[in-house]
């Protein structure tokens, strides 16, 4: 009662799921109490209500911390989503347990799928040989010789020829067809190898020819640059014979009025053009 007198206007609010706080006003109101005290039956109601309030206040200690049970109850009431989260977590745990316990089933499923896929590929690979020919076909020498001779004549067969050859060799038409397909593939592969070798030889020859042409081109470039070097050199000297000495020489030199000796093959002097200036007039 002392706490109720000192803390005037103290209100306690407890949050519920409906978000309607429960407010307890400990301050006594004068007007309604005065009105209720006018009648004797109201006094009994007021006294009983006061006793209930006192008991409630004794049970609730504001200063003490709430217990874990109270917190769980409050959180359970205040947060309706907690039930959903708990159910979701429970479902996750159950699925995890089922996954761990049923992991072998998943592996078995993967194994069966892998087996089925591998079986499908193996069936496709083996189907080309026919249903009866699951293993590699073993031919005798006579059968191989007949097939080789027939392939040399005709590398492809029509259905009638296939049936006739199959009956002759004691094979099925599918086996004969597969043998011809493989034989054509081997022939094509051999031809491809031959062409590859021929192309390699051609490449080697062209490489050698290219090297030779490059060498010749380098030599031609060197010869093209050589006249420029000769043009920069000084012209060669020439030896000229005196006309008087030529006259003294005799009749052997009468036919040749002038004689020029040149050390350079590039310089050629015309006859009579040089000595006409030096010869005296008669």
Curated annotation (Swiss-Prot):
GO terms for cellular component: nucleus. The keyword Transcription regulation applies. Residues 76-89 have a biased composition (Low complexity). The keyword Transcription regulation applies. It comes from the Eukaryota. Keywords: DNA-binding, Homeobox, Nucleus, Transcription, Transcription regulation. InterPro entries: HD, HD-ZIP_Homeobox_LZ_Class_II, HD-ZIP_N, Homeobox_CS, Homeodomain-like_sf, HTH_motif, Leu_zip_homeo. Interacts with BZIP30. This is Homeobox-leucine zipper protein HAT1. It comes from Arabidopsis thaliana (Mouse-ear cress). The gene is HAT1.
